[in-house]
Amino acid sequence: MPIRYISQKLAQQIDVELMSASGAFSLDQLMELAGLSCAQALAKSFPPTKHKHVMVACGPGNQGGDGLVAARHLHHFSYTPTVYLPKPSSKDFLQRLVKQCENLNIPILKDVDAFQTELAKSDVILDAIFGFSFQPPLRKPFDQVLKAIKGVSKKIPIVSVDIPSGWSVTDGPQPLWTEEDDKGGKEMIETFEPEVLVSLTAPKEGVKAFKGQHWLGGRFVPDELGKKHELNIPPYEGIDQVVELPRNH
C-alpha cells in the first residue's frame, strides 16, 4: 500500500495523540527525534566531506526547534552549522535548545544582513522556518529571508523540514504576500522548491507533487497509531531514523 499523504487537521490530531496519556511522548522528545531525523537525512544526501557548512534557518515555533536540534546533531556529525534565529521563543524548552547550541559554539545569528552574508558562504541550507501551521501573510524579517533563500536556490541545495517554508500544507507551492506596510502596500514573494524534503510522521498533502529526494523521518509513530490512521509507513532499516520514499516523476 502506498504511503498516505495527510491533511493539516490529521497531522495536528496525530500530534495530540502522540502527546496524550496513551501516546506518552512529551513535545521535546518528539522534537529531539524529529531534529535527529532531519540531521541524518541531510547527512545522507549531502555528506560533510563536500557540504561542510550548513545554514540552519529557524522560525520562531516548533519548526525552528526541530532546526535547533538538527544543528546540534550536525555539529556532532562533523558539519559546521550556523543557526539563523531572528525571533527566539520565550518557551523554556526552546530556550534550552538555543543554550545547547551555544554550548557547542554554534553561531546563532539574529540579524538578517548577517544571515545573508553567511548564507552566501554555505554549502547547504536546512529550511526549518515555517511548518504545517503557517498562515499568511508573510511577516518581517521572513520576507527577506525567503527571498534570499530563493535567490541562492539554484546554487546552494536546500533541505526542507516537513514542508517547504511558505508552501500551503494542502495545495503546495504558491505565491506569498507580505503584510501591508505603513502605506498599505504589500509584496508578492515567490516560494522556493528544495532539492530534498524530510517529511515528519507522514508526508503532507501539499507535497504530493514534490519531485526531489524525499525522506520520511520521525521514527516515533506506534504501529497501532499508524494502522488506526492508515498511514502505511514503510519500514525503517536498522538504526536509521529516516527512510527514503519513492520519487515522483
From Swiss-Prot:
GO terms for molecular function: metal ion binding; NAD(P)HX epimerase activity; nucleotide binding. One of its GO terms (cellular component) is mitochondrion. Pfam families: YjeF_N. Coiled coil: none annotated. Its cofactor is K(+). SUPFAM superfamilies: YjeF N-terminal domain-like. It is found in: Cytoplasm; Mitochondrion. PROSITE patterns: YJEF_N. Binds 1 potassium ion per subunit. It comes from the Eukaryota. It catalyses: (6R)-NADHX = (6S)-NADHX; (6R)-NADPHX = (6S)-NADPHX. Its EC number is 5.1.99.6. Residues 11-233 form the YjeF N-terminal domain. Keywords: Cytoplasm, Isomerase, Metal-binding, Mitochondrion, NAD, NADP, Nucleotide-binding, Potassium. Its main location: cytoplasm. K(+) binds at residues 63, 127, 165. Catalyzes the epimerization of the S- and R-forms of NAD(P)HX, a damaged form of NAD(P)H that is a result of enzymatic or heat-dependent hydration. This is a prerequisite for the S-specific NAD(P)H-hydrate dehydratase to allow the repair of both epimers of NAD(P)HX. NCBIfam families: yjeF_nterm. Belongs to the NnrE/AIBP family. This is NAD(P)H-hydrate epimerase. It comes from Cryptococcus neoformans var. neoformans serotype D (strain JEC21 / ATCC MYA-565). The lineage of its organism: Eukaryota, Fungi, Dikarya, Basidiomycota, Agaricomycotina.
